[in-house]
Amino acid sequence: MFSLLKMIRTLALLACLCAISIEAFGTVQSAGVKGVLICNGKPAANVKVKLYDEDTTDLDDLLQEGLTDEDGKFELSGKETEITQIDPKLNIYHDCNDESLPCLKKFSIYIPKDYVSEGPSPRKIFDAGTLNLSGKFSGEGRDCLN
């Protein structure tokens, strides 16, 4: 019992030290994305959009989230401190042509690496263009917990 508590305490201390080292030795990086969402030719208002830094070893880091405006427009940006380059992606959660089914459709758009900036504010914003949500997107699935 004593050795188990000692091991848990050691692992907790190690996790804290790792988090501190990332902040101390990592680089602040940022990314941004904008676009317009439509559904059947009309603006898709109040669609949830989230900008993440995709991580392979732990949960993705949420950089910013928001909703499209009445014209279907959105713009998100955010920053994260990482030792390696961040991997930004945009998640879009919608129910275009799908209102009666449970959960929302979800798909991701990966932001090119040349849109990642060093520092707290992105130097350039990735323009995802106009996306018609009535179509099917590669990797599209359903998300009930967004």
Which functions belong to the PLM regions below?
Residues 1-16:
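Classical eukaryotic N-terminal signal peptides for Sec-dependent ER targeting/secretion
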Residues 16-130, 138, 142, 146:
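Beta-strand-dominated extracellular/periplasmic modules and repeats
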